[in-house]
């Protein structure tokens, strides 16, 4: 998380809504040898207290979960390079704007009996965004194929103790300079630059 308090929004609801909508992040656990990292889709509860996810059975993280372990999920949003020329101000330096939320807590394996319900909820969450396409459901799979797939993955849950977010959107610049940079960022370098420009204008 960025140390500048101008970028460290304390709006927990905003962090939760962003992470819930994004529903994809980087799960990290510490070990004696090296951090273990996995990119995971997930479901976050409406109050931000619980994350549900699944991991493929061969994932090294699962081998460490003989008991609940401390973990963190980093959820990234849009990001982009900001040229100092865009501000219309003297003596500026390049920077990179971005949005990120970190969910920290204890992660554990869950009983295999919970997996089908989790997968149904996850697929429903994502399929709803594809409307008016008819929703895919696991019922479209043959029982044998579904059973083979279910044996390959394991349900997990993280109980969230802390949520922190960085919304680095040039809030430390005058409104006119931030607006000017937002106008230019869409043609620049980064990811989801249209979204980033909108967030900068609203900062």
Residue ranges and their predicted role:
Residues 21-57, 73:
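Short beta-strand segments
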Residues 21, 36, 47, 67, ...:
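A short, structural micro-pattern
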Residues 108-203:
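C-terminal edge-of-domain segments
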Residues 2-26:
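Short, basic/aromatic recognition patches
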Residues 52, 72, 102-104, 155-159:
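Beta-strand secondary-structure signal
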Residues 16, 91-92, 145-148:
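A generic local secondary-structure boundary/capping motif
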Residues 57-121:
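Short, structured beta-strand-loop surface elements
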Residues 29, 55, 75-77, 160-162, ...:
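Pocket-edge structural micro-motifs
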């Amino acid at each position: 998380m960025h140390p500048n308090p101008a970028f460290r929004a304390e709006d927990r609801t905003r962090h939760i809504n962003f992470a819930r909508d994004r529903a994809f992040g980087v799960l990290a656990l510490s070990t004696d040898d090296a951090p273990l990292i996995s990119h995971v889709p997930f479901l976050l509860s409406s109050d931000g207290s619980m994350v549900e996810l699944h991991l493929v059975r061969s994932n090294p993280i699962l081998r460490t979960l003989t008991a609940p372990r401390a973990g963190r999920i980093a959820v990234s949003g849009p990001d982009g390079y900001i040229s100092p020329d865009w501000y219309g101000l003297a003596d500026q330096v390049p920077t990179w704007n971005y949005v990120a939320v970190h969910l920290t807590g204890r992660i554990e394996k869950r009983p295999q009996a919970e997996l089908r319900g989790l997968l149904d909820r996850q697929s429903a969450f994502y399929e709803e965004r594809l409307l008016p396409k008819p929703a895919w459901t696991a019922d479209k799979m043959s029982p044998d194929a579904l059973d083979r797939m279910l044996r390959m993955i394991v349900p997990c849950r993280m109980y969230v103790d802390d949520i922190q977010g960085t919304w680095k959107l040039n809030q430390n610049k005058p409104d006119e300079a931030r607006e000017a940079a937002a106008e230019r960022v869409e043609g620049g370098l980064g990811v989801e630059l249209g979204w980033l420009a909108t967030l900068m204008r609203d900062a």
